[in-house]
């Protein structure tokens, strides 16, 4: 519901039905309505309570709860730093105008993640149950299937985006300004494909007894991202920031998946993904040949 209302607000602003102030007010109303509806729903279930019961939380439970909550907060903060870091470095080193162009590219690339949320929500309860039952054969099989389907879905969306990238920028207002970030869209889309395909490894780790290592790997991701942004943005500009994200996630998943494979004996990677990758690369090669050579030949023939 909230996504649909937000989309409507964005479209109204894009087609000049409302101005910037109207968009801000509309977004505030959208989230306000969603909050009120959630509260009403909770009261209708009669499972919400504001009564404080200190005796319910024992001393050992309180300690574990506080430590685990602090761990989750730290992990979430570190994980959400990467997009903010890129925006911060791009705007700080290249200016707000370039940051705006980069942001549009980020939004276009983020469409690759659309299937991830649904597939991840479906798979997590099954992975959690498998880890609880210590059924590693089932977990390993499920992990590989989830990774493969995430890879297929995200790559399919990326393929649709990339072969229509010029059309997308033509539709966007001032697209002739923003289309200089095409390479950023390409690199960030690859980042999204890697993240959606391999993030099931992080899910496995979070449900295991080694969950606290998640923070270590997230710190590695953050430090790598900061270092690569500092090094690459002055050299390559927006493309440097996108490349910094790509390198950071590659380093992150090398450490993460190696640890998960070593300690938990589970890996999301399989030969099926390699075969799929080869097919996808072949499709991109065909698309490149069509655009670079064959289309020019056809135009030449018809002109003659």
Show the residue positions of the predicted features.
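Transmembrane alpha-helical segments of multi-pass transport proteins
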Residues: 30, 186, 221-224, 271-304
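Membrane-interface junctions at transmembrane-helix termini in multi-pass inner-membrane proteins
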Residues: 1, 189-220, 231, 260-262
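Interfacial transmembrane-helix starts/ends
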Residues: 65-66, 103, 127, 135-164, ...
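Interhelical loop/hinge segments that connect adjacent transmembrane helices in multipass membrane
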Residues: 16-26, 38-83, 126-141, 263-276
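Hydrophobic alpha-helical transmembrane segments
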Residues: 1-46, 219-224, 238-259, 282, ...
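Interfacial segments at transmembrane-helix termini and the short loops linking adjacent helices
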Residues: 96, 162-192, 239
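Interfacial/gating helices of multi-pass transporter permease domains
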Residues: 20-25, 60-72, 87-110, 136-141, ...
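Helix-loop junctions and terminal segments of transmembrane helices
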Residues: 105-147, 202-207
